[in-house]
Amino acid sequence: QELASFHSVSKGFMGECGFR
């Protein structure tokens, strides 16, 4: 369960970084 939360945050952070 915690892994999913971490994955979601990591994906959002990486996506935002790539978007900018």
Curated annotation (Swiss-Prot):
The keyword ATP-binding does not apply. GO terms for cellular component: cytoplasm. It is found in: Cytoplasm. InterPro entries: PyrdxlP-dep_Trfase_major (IPR015421). It is an enzyme of class 2 (transferase). GO terms for molecular function: L-alanine:2-oxoglutarate aminotransferase activity. Keywords: Aminotransferase, Cytoplasm, Glycation, Glycoprotein, Pyridoxal phosphate, Transferase. Its cofactor is pyridoxal 5'-phosphate. Its EC number is 2.6.1.2. Glycation of Lys-11 inactivates the enzyme. The keyword Transferase applies. The modification N6-(pyridoxal phosphate)lysine is found at residue 11. One of its GO terms (biological process) is L-alanine catabolic process. It catalyses: L-alanine + 2-oxoglutarate = pyruvate + L-glutamate. Disulfide bonds: none annotated. Pathway: Amino-acid degradation; L-alanine degradation via transaminase pathway; pyruvate from L-alanine: step 1/1. Glycans are attached at residue 11. Homodimer. Catalyzes the reversible transamination between alanine and 2-oxoglutarate to form pyruvate and glutamate. Participates in cellular nitrogen metabolism and also in liver gluconeogenesis starting with precursors transported from skeletal muscles. Belongs to the class-I pyridoxal-phosphate-dependent aminotransferase family. Alanine aminotransferase subfamily. This is Alanine aminotransferase 1.
